[in-house]
Amino acid sequence: MSTHTNLPLLIAGLWRYLPARIVTNGELEAEHGLAAGWIARYTGVHQRHRVTDESSSYMGAQAAREALDDAGMTLADIDLILNASGTPEQSIPDTGVLIQRQLGVHAAGIPAISIHATCMSFLVALDISATLIAAGRYRSILIVSTEVSSAALNVREPENFTLFGDAAAAAVVTAPPQPWNGVLPAIHRARFETYSEGADLAALPGGGTRLHPNNPALQPEHNFFHMDGPGVLRLTRRYGMSFLEQLQPGLSHGLEDIDLVIPHQASRMGLKMLGAFGWPDTKIVRTLDMLGNCIAASIPATLYEAVRQGRLSRGNKVLLVGTGAGISLGGVILTY
């Protein structure tokens, strides 16, 4: 829960992978009997990418290869692979293992593990990576967030079924070799809070040891994701102001020295709520309309977009922030 400061960390490489298949609102509205324009009005999403035959590990490996190339590095430079995703490819073995296999280094011995905090997984992985690198435990870490949300969406809940998209993103992080214009890339502040009173507001009950395959109580609907969007927003509003003030004093009513905000692309209303904090719209990066909510891949995929558009440059200070199932709140302030 504590907010630490100034751990050197360089995002040396960054990339994303989007499935080729684009699913438009018109397609979903026609297929599921929804009124024309309903999806955009309700969710803020205009299209989303969805897999055809791609697996989570395949998408993650594709993003990882490009991120390594972007960093000018190879897998021989990587000490640890962190799968930071909310949707596992299978229960056992861990998706990190499957990503390693997809990368073709199955005999290299690179440790591959997972960090699972649903939509906040990438932020938690960044924070943990900075700590591990600062401690000298690892030098360079490959973080992969890969999500096939479409596998567990319930068509009976159009507000959720139409909101989510599939995507993967990867980042190579390491200790910065030198400052840029006198500014050292670092995580300046990071904070996470969880309020388990909201545990049932965003949940997929099946797939674990409670509603297991041999449990006679298991029903098909237990394997679908359910989210009470208004309930999540209410809980976020209750704790959001205090959380932001703990992350950095003054953040609940302005951005002070923050150059850009990369929020989790949770929903139209979730993004709209950011205006209540006095954050200028020009400093907020949005990809919800074109990608949908891509769970843990949302923040790194949007970060990638900001860099490629030239909105985020070396030496800029950026806020990565959002919520995840739990309900969990997370925020990281870093110099890119």
Question: What name fits each language-model region?
Answer:
Residues 22-23, 92-94, 126-127, 152-157, ...:
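Short acidic, glycine/serine/threonine-rich loops at helix termini
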Residues 12, 84, 116, 141-147, ...:
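Short beta-strand segments
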Residues 70, 74-106:
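Anion-binding (especially nucleotide phosphate/pyrophosphate-binding) glycine-rich loop
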Residues 57, 61-62, 68, 87-88, ...:
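Claisen-condensing/thiolase-fold acyl-transfer catalytic domains that form or cleave C-C bonds
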Residues 1-53, 157-234, 238, 242, ...:
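Condensing-enzyme catalytic core mediating Claisen C-C bond formation in acyl metabolism
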Residues 134-168:
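Flexible, glycine-rich active-site loops centered on histidine and acidic residues
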Residues 30-39, 91-105, 143-149, 209-217, ...:
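Acidic-glycine-rich active-site phosphate/pyrophosphate-binding loop
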Residues 76-84, 255-264:
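Short glycine-rich phosphate-binding loop at a beta-alpha junction
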